[in-house]
């Protein structure tokens, strides 16, 4: 939002800058903490917000991958294509997330630290529609217009690289990367990513 408005600065942009500075001041005592489990626990979370950009009606994607409760990879970005529905936006976000997950899984296997090389990486999603599209493509003929590159997630699932898992919206750690949240909910998600305050 802030980056998109650098050409024409308005009062709302100054408000955004002030909010960012307040956030930085408020979070100066924040650290990223990883759990001390003996075995690595890797989880991925994906989310999307449907047509959140009021200027061009594009959706926002976000993902977070954690190892032992601490974030190791995350991304928030505007989707490059228009979505017709929330499920489609979530499916596109899941596909982009799956690519990162497959790369991470292979990297950890090459290092010899992935807990079980034959197990898929769990990718948590709060959209039943997106999960169904990824797992059962033959039942979704109305989504033929979705760009072919987003269907790569189906191959990842069939190869056993990724396993799509349903998660409740309130527990989806990627939620803050797609939209603004009330502060208590935002802080709950931050803690789930391994972000802790010095006072904790």
Located regions from the model:
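C-terminal reverse transcriptase regions that engage the nucleic-acid substrate
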Residues: 1-29, 168, 176-178
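Contiguous, well-ordered alpha-helical segments that form the cores/surfaces of helical PPI scaffolds
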Residues: 1-4, 48-50, 63, 129
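Residues immediately flanking
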Residues: 36, 46-48, 67-69, 125-127, ...
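Structured nucleic-acid-interacting core domains from mobile-element enzymes and related host factors
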Residues: 22-46, 116-117
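RNase H-like nuclease module associated with reverse transcription
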Residues: 4, 41, 59, 77-200
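Conserved helix-loop functional segments at active or binding sites
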Residues: 26-30, 51, 71-74, 107-113
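Conserved active-site beta-strand-loop modules that form the wall/rim of enzyme catalytic pockets
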Residues: 29-30, 41-43, 62-64, 70-71, ...
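RNase H-like nuclease fold core
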Residues: 45-87
């Amino acid at each position: 939002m802030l980056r998109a408005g650098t050409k024409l600065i308005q009062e709302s942009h100054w408000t955004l800058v002030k909010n960012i500075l307040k956030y930085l001041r408020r979070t100066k005592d924040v650290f990223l903490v990883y759990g001390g489990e003996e075995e690595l626990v890797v989880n991925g979370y994906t989310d999307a917000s449907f047509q959140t950009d009021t200027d061009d009606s594009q959706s926002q994607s976000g993902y977070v991958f954690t190892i032992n409760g601490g974030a190791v990879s995350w991304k928030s970005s505007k989707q490059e294509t228009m979505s017709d529905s929330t499920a489609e936006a979530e499916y596109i976000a899941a596909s982009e997330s799956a690519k990162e997950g497959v790369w991470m899984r292979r990297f950890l296997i090459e290092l010899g630290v992935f807990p079980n090389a034959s197990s898929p990486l769990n990718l948590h999603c709060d959209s039943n529609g997106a999960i169904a599209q990824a797992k059962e493509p033959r039942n979704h003929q109305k989504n033929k217009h979705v760009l072919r590159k987003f269907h790569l997630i189906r191959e990842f699932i069939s190869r056993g690289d990724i396993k799509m898992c349903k998660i409740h919206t309130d527990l989806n750690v990627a939620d803050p990367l797609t939209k603004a949240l009330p502060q208590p909910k935002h802080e709950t998600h931050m803690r789930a990513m391994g972000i802790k305050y010095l006072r904790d």
